[in-house]
A protein has these predicted regions:
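Basic, amphipathic alpha-helical segments enriched in Lys/Arg and hydrophobic/aromatic residues
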Residues: 175-215
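Short coil/turn segments at secondary-structure boundaries
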Residues: 3-19, 62, 118-121, 162-170, ...
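Phosphate-backbone recognition surface of nucleic-acid-processing proteins
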Residues: 74-77, 83-84, 88-176, 180, ...
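Non-catalytic, well-ordered alpha-helical scaffold segments
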Residues: 2, 38, 42-45, 84-87, ...
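Short, conserved alpha-helical segments within structured domains
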Residues: 21-24, 77, 81, 144, ...
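Glycine-rich, often acidic, oxyanion-interacting loops/wings at catalytic, nucleic-acid
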Residues: 1-74, 214
Length: 215
């Protein structure tokens, strides 16, 4: 709805969701100054209505197709990986054998920690000697698959709010002095590693094996 955003007289409070509601559309269209802008906005409303009708049908078709994958019954046993998330996993990853280790998957899903270092060597008695110091962290890698990151991040966020083994993992990490955002990252990475391991082995979820690493 860029036409609304471009009109300076339109109050900024309208940047929420009210502009999309059917009962509010006539009021918003009336605020546009010329017929061309109103036509474009009305066309976008028509497109939005059509997409809203197609969305549940597309979702149902996606899940129906995903159910035919042999990995479906395995992945559906993992907590907080519902039908849509599993369908997205299957479509995005296609096969777990693309990732030799969990760290390869973490990098692909944007869960790998990026480090930087400088001045790694110093001259001692005329000889270069490597300094002993930890590299500096620069956050998570940005070149990643956003769909996959959203799947694992969404599942981990849901797990932190529901009692169970995964929430216990989250609370245990915090109890060791880790900040909440880093604890969520730890849980997200654990979920990704768990998914990779179960998918490769064809095993169903077992909460007693949460500490088993993916290989």
């Amino acid at each position: 709805m860029n036409d609304f955003d471009d009109e300076r007289p339109v109050e900024r409070a309208g940047q929420g969701t009210a502009v999309y509601h059917r009962q509010q559309r006539a009021r918003w269209l009336a605020r546009l100054p010329d017929g061309g802008a109103r036509f474009r906005a009305d066309a976008l409303y028509a497109e939005l209505d059509l997409l809203r009708q197609l969305r549940p049908k597309a979702k149902a078709a996606m899940v129906t197709e995903a159910r035919q994958d042999p990995a479906w019954p395995v992945l559906r046993t993992i907590p907080f990986l519902g039908p849509v998330r599993v369908a997205l996993l299957l479509a995005t990853m296609q096969t777990p054998w693309r990732f030799r280790t969990k760290r390869n998957l973490w990098a692909y899903a944007g869960l790998a920690v990026v480090t930087r270092s400088s001045a790694d060597y110093a001259l001692v008695a005329g000889q270069p000697v490597r300094r002993r110091r930890a590299p500096m962290t620069r956050g998570l890698n940005r070149n990643h698959n956003r769909v996959l990151k959203d799947v694992f991040k969404g599942a981990a966020t849901a797990a932190t709010a529901r009692p169970g083994p995964l929430q216990d993992v989250y609370h245990n990490v915090i109890a060791r002095g880790t900040r909440e955002e880093l604890a969520r990252l730890t849980l997200t990475r654990k979920l990704a590693a768990l998914t990779l391991r179960l998918w490769k082995k064809g095993e169903r979820y077992d909460p007693t094996k949460l500490t088993t690493p993916a290989r």
